[in-house]
A protein has these predicted regions:
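Non-catalytic accessory segments of hydrolases
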Residues: 18-221, 245, 403
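Active-site rim elements
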Residues: 131-136, 216-221, 287-295, 349, ...
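Substrate-access "cap/lid" subdomains that shape
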Residues: 236, 262, 270, 275, ...
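Alpha/beta-hydrolase active-site loop
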Residues: 216-239, 298-302
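Alpha/beta-hydrolase fold nucleophile elbow
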Residues: 242-253
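Mobile gating loops/cap/lid regions near enzyme active sites that modulate substrate access
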Residues: 386, 438, 446-498
Length: 498
């Protein structure tokens, strides 16, 4: 149990554990500290002091909690990020910065991941209980930090740069997760950067008063603007860490991969990166606009107004100043507790940061013409199946019996229904659950991946597509090659030999 439990406790994105068999000292090693001065870097804001991280092969220079923008507080809440503030003395960069405001409760996804590993029920419950009782990392609105790891501190060494944007449905996650602190990528001559960005209502809330207060007449998409600010900072400063500002690859998984596609769709990010990797995510599905609703769902601005009014935080006509005066805890608690706004705060087509829906920009050949690598996992839907069966604003009840489910299926898919039923084996009771989960994964990830890949290929641009099929090793596992299963392989941060 405890070998599998350790894997889960460490890999589930928040707990700090040292990988077995990798012998990495996450702090300044004794040998290095007695021989070497801590690594230094001169950036536009001042001088940074990092730490040496010892591996089996060499020393890596690590800089943590580096500000790439001013704290988004006060008048900068729900505003484009401002330039980072300078400092006069040498600044310590050995500790991670706070993660952005988000729920710290255990997600249904995480529970499904634990139970899908094939553990006996008592052991699975012990892992879930341990995860649920953990102390969450520090959290703050002041969270616009990035972390860098490099193998060569020679300025202008021109090492390739990879910039990681984490997943988490645009609602959770942090750049400081142990899973993303790779040493293998830097050992191969890559400058690795992981960056935070604002989440949930702090990152994607829209409101007419905020739009009116904005110089470009828009609101929402602050998380995308944070990512763009991080890329601008990298352009200005990465040479100090041995990186090449003309060879920057952006990559991410799930919402982080969607963020990559959003950056490809934003003219504000043009020239700030040169290649893109998307792992299980392309943001071609979201239909809501800043001022445009969809099939009875209101626009992003109306959703923002309703969020404040229905939770007693502000009136429908509140000013931008009144909204910015609301406490961050009150905003976060309302977003977590009011299920009417679950998943309501997402990137939107605002006509500026996102000129149109990502889907339309892909079809109109207006996404960035850079080389891309993208793909998805064989069992993307396995851990989301329970969510899929829950009632939503567009699906108020989910039939329990197979005949009723097939009738609903035929109603929704019309002429295509029989082909899909046969393709996924949905007419066989013993296969229905697995076929439906498989279809869910294709619908959520596969379709959007293939859409962008095909469109890119039609433009005769370099495109590479993969599918990840590695499954957990334990007999009895049901998660399969689940969502996010490839991440430890990308970063080589395995917590068990797999």
């Amino acid at each position: 149990m405890f070998r599998i439990a350790l894997l889960l406790l460490c890999c589930l994105f928040q707990l700090s554990c040292v990988p077995i068999g990798q012998q990495i000292n996450a702090t300044l090693s004794t040998d290095a500290s007695t021989i070497l001065e801590s690594p230094k870097a001169e950036v536009e804001q001042g001088r940074l002091s990092g730490l040496w991280q010892k591996t089996d092969e060499d020393l890596l220079a690590v800089f943590r909690g580096v500000s790439f923008a001013a704290p988004p507080l006060g008048r900068l809440r729900w505003a484009a990020p401002a330039s980072p503030l300078p400092w006069s003395n040498e600044k310590d960069a050995t500790e991670f910065g706070a993660q952005c405001m988000q729920s710290s409760s255990l997600s249904l996804f995480t529970e499904s991941l634990v139970r899908g590993q094939g553990l006996p029920e008592s052991e699975a419950q012990a892992v879930i209980s341990a995860l649920a009782s953990r102390t969450p990392p520090p959290m703050s609105e002041d969270c616009l930090f990035l972390n860098l790891t490099t193998s060569n501190m020679v300025p202008a060494k021109n090492l390739p740069v990879m910039v990681w944007f984490h997943g988490g449905s645009h609602q959770t996650g942090t750049a400081s997760s142990p899973t993303y602190q790779s040493t293998k990528l830097p050992q191969q001559g890559i400058v690795l950067v992981t960056a935070n960005y604002r989440l949930g209502p702090f990152g994607y809330l829209a409101h007419p008063a905020l739009s009116a207060n904005d110089p470009n007449g828009v609101s929402s998409n602050y998380g995308i603007l944070d990512q763009i600010a991080a890329l601008r900072w990298i352009q200005d400063n990465i040479a100090a860490f041995g990186g090449d500002p003309n060879n920057v690859t952006i990559f991410g998984e799930s919402a982080g991969a969607q963020a990559v596609s959003e950056l490809m769709a934003s003219p504000l990010a043009d020239g700030l990166y040169h290649k893109a990797i998307m792992q299980s995510g392309v943001y071609s599905w979201h239909p809501i606009g800043l001022k445009r609703g969809f099939r009875g769902i209101p626009s992003a601005e109306v959703i923002g107004q309703s969020f404040f009014a229905l939770n007693g935080l502000a009136t429908m006509t509140a000013s931008a100043a009144e909204l910015r005066a609301i406490s961050s805890d009150a905003i976060l608690n309302a977003a977590i507790s009011d299920r009417r706004f679950l998943g309501a705060f997402l990137p939107v087509a605002d006509g500026y940061v996102q000129p149109d829906r990502v889907l339309n920009l892909i079809l109109d050949e207006k996404t960035a013409p850079v080389p891309i690598l993208l793909g998805y996992n064989a069992d993307e839907g396995s851990l989301f199946y329970q969510w899929y069966q829950r009632a939503t604003r567009m699906n108020h009840e989910f039939p329990n019996e197979l005949p009723a489910r097939l009738a609903r299926f035929r109603e929704v898919f019309s002429d295509d229904a029989e082909m899909l039923i046969q393709a996924y084996g949905l007419d066989e009771p013993e296969r229905y659950k697995y076929g439906e989960a498989d279809m869910l994964g294709d619908d959520s990830y596969g379709v959007h991946t293939r859409l962008l890949a095909d469109a890119h290929a039609m433009r005769e641009l370099p495109v590479y597509v993969y599918q990840f099929r590695r499954t957990p090793p334990r007999v009895g596992q049901t998660a399969g090659a689940h969502h996010a299963a490839e991440i430890p392989f990308v970063f080589d941060t395995h917590y068990l030999p797999l």
